[in-house]
A protein has these predicted regions:
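Secondary-structure edge/capping motif, primarily at the C-terminal ends of alpha-helices
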Residues: 6-13, 62-66
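Amphipathic alpha-helical packing segments from all-alpha helical-bundle domains
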Residues: 4-5, 14-42, 49-53
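C-terminal peripheral helix-coil segments that are non-catalytic and often amphipathic
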Residues: 31-43, 52-89
């Protein structure tokens, strides 16, 4: 249920923050993912934008665990392995 809040209300809350706070502390997903990949010495084949969008897609599956059912852990692992194979193999 917490991820439903995040999906629906994060944008609203972000707009309420003062601009200087956002400038100092908020970065888009791609910035954080780029930093993590660079620290690991990884360069995704499809580029950073694709890697960031893929990670966002994987994160969004968390809010659909109930619909996916008891196989969610295996489904997520399959998706992650496939994404890694496509981006880095």
């Amino acid at each position: 249920k917490a991820f439903v809040f995040i999906e629906n209300d994060a944008d609203f809350l972000l707009h309420r923050l003062p601009e200087e706070v956002k400038t100092a502390h908020y970065h888009d997903d791609e910035t954080h993912i780029r930093t993590l990949l660079e620290l690991g010495g990884l360069q995704p084949k499809g580029g950073m934008a694709l890697a960031a969008a893929t990670v966002r897609g994987l994160i969004l599956t968390v809010s659909h665990q109930e619909q996916i059912g008891v196989l969610y852990p295996q489904v997520l692992e399959t998706l992650v392995r496939g994404a890694c194979r496509e981006l880095f193999a």
